[in-house]
Amino acid sequence: MNKDLDYIFPDPPEGVDPRALDPERIPESVAIIMDGNGRWAKKRALNRLKGHKAGIEAVREAIRCASDLGVRYLTIYSFSTENWSRPQDEVDALMKLLRNYMKTCLKTAEKNRMCVRVLGDKTRLDEDIRTRIAELEEATKNNDGLHFQIAINYGGRDEIVRAVKKPSAKVQSGEVDPAGITADTL
């Protein structure tokens, strides 16, 4: 590791040189759940939107650190299916932040050869956001740098429901014999 990593480790423990990190011990994949932006803002007497904006800055820093450290995959869990139950003005503000982030994310991806994928159920997102996602994924699909995955409108329960519906529909249409459904076919 020969990059200047002082910004990641501004005050390393005594005897630790960040430039001597063993690349073999750097994880290939890192996942971050974006939780607590509202609490962060409240603790600082700021409105929740300021917390969400700070969260976006944290994502930018995570991308930079992951790239510099040689992490291959970075997944950010940013907006769960449960987040739709927040007050409508907060959901609207989050969608506006997402729209703006998609623009800057493309610039970052182009600059750093980053491949971007958006995970989750995109059907509930507005058409313009789905279009931006499709453009971003298409523009970056052949990039060979950090693989950045953004989970939007995701949820464990929702994933299970969608996983069950797919083979159920095939059984109902006669395409698949129920006896043929195994863990591998799911």
Feature-to-residue mapping (PLM):
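Flexible, compositionally biased loop and terminal segments
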Residues: 1-186
